[in-house]
């Protein structure tokens, strides 16, 4: 209760202190570009960004929200984004050990408001992925999101608050959050339909597998809706990266035609097998790996069960067989079609900077695969910069 009461004081003080400066310091030619976007709820194409220099290459006519995971933004980025009706939101996390600390929470919320207002941006994207198994702590996280959402909306009802969540609400990676509460206290959830093999149970021998399968995505969405969460509050997060599993442990049987690659057992949060046995690589690197004529690799194969591509190659240094699981335009399109069929709020990508933008032949179809979510997807022939 103390948090809620003091929130009104936070909002009043921040609003008063920023009202005189909100129109000054605008880096754009037109001051209206420094106002938060006033756009009603809409279908989403959200991009997570970790690189502050790539924005001139984005297809701004396809994006709706850009979640920023770096410290500062270029002035031009703000102007371009708002000119194209794209929200800029700050990716943020929170130390769960302070979830019961009301004074810390009050100060943290004020800092987030000041950050958003001083940068003329549009809200927050919560990316908390810590294990929480105590229902009391899970409820405290919901209360944090609720208090943050109320504080932001009291200043501007068009500020956006979104929450990144695991691909299923079934305590994935011991993230036993109050998902229904998080959904009802935010604009939408981003179900991260990747890293689906972070915990693999029931395998006597650990094996490599798909990073993002439609069957798991569907099961996860159904689990969310079973909690009473509307599909309109769910965004399907998809990967522009894959996993390389080094040294298939198949003995003499390992080769370029290997289908099932046995891997090392690397436990993670209670599971004996996990994708931690592999390493993440961005899509542009995997394309280069496939195109490298000095590396002996198989053709891209297709797993019909997981509806995902993979390939094998001989490591030129060790001579071992490595297996690669990733997503390409074909596998992404299947999941995007699923998102359409389920009437989800939209799609998202981790992360938007994992492409080689100088290679239009391979990068453009990845954009178009996600943009196909929209009934009349915008052409990506040119980025708007």
From Swiss-Prot:
SUPFAM superfamilies linked to this entry: (Trans)glycosidases (SSF51445)
GO biological process, one term: oligosaccharide catabolic process
PROSITE patterns, per the entry: GH18_2
Location of the active site: 129 (proton donor)
Subcellular location: Lysosome
Residues bearing carbohydrate: 51, 101, 223, 272, 296
Record has Glycoprotein as a keyword: yes
Cellular-component GO terms for this entry: lysosome
SMART domains: Glyco_18
InterPro entries membership: Chitinase_II/V-like_cat, Chitinase_insertion_sf, DIAC_cat, GH18_Domain-Containing, Glyco_hydro18_cat, Glycoside_hydrolase_SF
Signal peptide: 1-15
CDD domains (alphabetical): GH18_chitobiase
All residue ranges annotated as the GH18 domain in the record: 16-377
Keyword annotations from UniProtKB, A to Z: Glycoprotein, Glycosidase, Hydrolase, Lysosome, Signal
EC number: 3.2.1.-
GO molecular function, one term: hydrolase activity, acting on glycosyl bonds
Reported function: Involved in the degradation of asparagine-linked glycoproteins. May hydrolyze of N-acetyl-beta-D-glucosamine (1-4)N-acetylglucosamine chitobiose core from the reducing end of the bond.
PANTHER family: DI-N-ACETYLCHITOBIASE
Family note: Belongs to the glycosyl hydrolase 18 family.
Protein name as catalogued: Probable di-N-acetylchitobiase 2
Biological source species: Dictyostelium discoideum
